[in-house]
Amino acid sequence: MNVKIANKYALLLANLDVDFIKSVEGEFTPEEIIMQFSNFFFNKMVLDITAIKDYQDITKIQELSVNMDMSKVILLLDDSEVTNSPRYLSQLVSMGIYNFTRNVDAIKFLIDNPNSYKDVAQYHQLNTVMTYDAPVEHNNNGNESVVTEYIERPQVRVIGVK
């Protein structure tokens, strides 16, 4: 009663010792995934993150988390710098996505033993605040472009004053 959505890691997921009632392969927008599986009953969904179009943009993952039960989704992360960054992992945890791995062998374990918040709390960064600095102009061969820089700064909390 499991489903699989694969792209880059389709070959690795094909060797997985798990029964799938439905398997799709390719790159999909979050809307396409939601439409295809919103009225489809399944136990767990194994989702290759590369199957989500523009997956490095965390808002695409957020769109899935708002419209699907993420406790049923096991996210197979790729080896890119973006998806392995502490900030990206923290945002996954903030969205309620606790079942993610970079290891294909861990998928079977996560199907039988899903993670809770306690299992992934070490990835959650609570004291980081995003600030938006003023746009910075860069000149590239006479073409001007405006780039907004994002800076992470630790938030200071005052507990008490004596």
For the regions a protein language model found, what residue spans apply to each?
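Walker A/P-loop phosphate-binding motif and the immediately C-terminal alpha-helix
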Residues: 140-162
